[in-house]
């Protein structure tokens, strides 16, 4: 099957022109009401990349969307987040939809740290589902942005726009925290699977063959994006996946140091370290003792 070549929209203005909008209200940000578009179906069955961030809120059921490796058929009250320069593939679309799309350039957010907004790295099957009350909160902030867009550009516009975008994203962090709580039974099962996978990785000798396990390895095994997996684990345990992996690794090391006569180098290689000194450094950082000192005291 021939791969569809993506259509690239480098800027907010380029995207607005493609929608048939000759007048761009601001070159770095725009709010698009999907029901104002003449024919959404024309954008279906196509791959896109964009040089800007986009946040899409859908009021009604939409067609399929592929983002990264996953496909999702999403429903009412759903928010999707797309980072710049990622492939977005749309399936068959209907002619019209109810919803809002917020698009903004990375240049707008200069001076604002984007790293806390990890949901831009989530897969589409990890979308945010919002309540009516949450939807109204976001709608009110979008209203502020629309007011600024209609007002015209002055020396305050950029800062006010960026602050309102950041406010929306901060609310989305809160709403995702709520979603993690309401999904706790499902997420607890994922945590149990993660623990089993972690145990098996060392029990089956994968560490010696493939190296120290990575967060990406377990996220892939659970069919989650690395960002969503990290936030899920943090919400469930208070620790990052990397911290849990290191804790498990040190527990394995303690066991081997006290129950075998293997050298420190042999243990390091068995646990996936290419260089024993890296293992010794991590062990001392975690325990306050070198492996040799720990073995001597055991």
Identify the residue ranges that each predicted region occupies.
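Generic protein-terminus/edge-of-domain signal
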Residues: 1-66, 70-72
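Short acidic-glycine-tyrosine-enriched beta hairpin
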Residues: 69-81
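Short hydrophobic/aromatic patch on the recognition helix
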Residues: 77, 229, 278-279, 283
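A hydrophobic/aromatic-rich effector-binding and dimerization subdomain
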Residues: 91-153
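An amphipathic alpha-helical interaction segment
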Residues: 140-199
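A short, Lys/Arg-enriched amphipathic alpha-helix from helix-turn-helix/homeodomain DNA-binding modules
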Residues: 184-222, 243-262
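Terminal helix-turn-helix DNA-binding modules in bacterial transcription factors
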Residues: 235-274, 296-298
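…primarily DNA-binding HTH/wHTH and HhH modules…
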Residues: 280-298
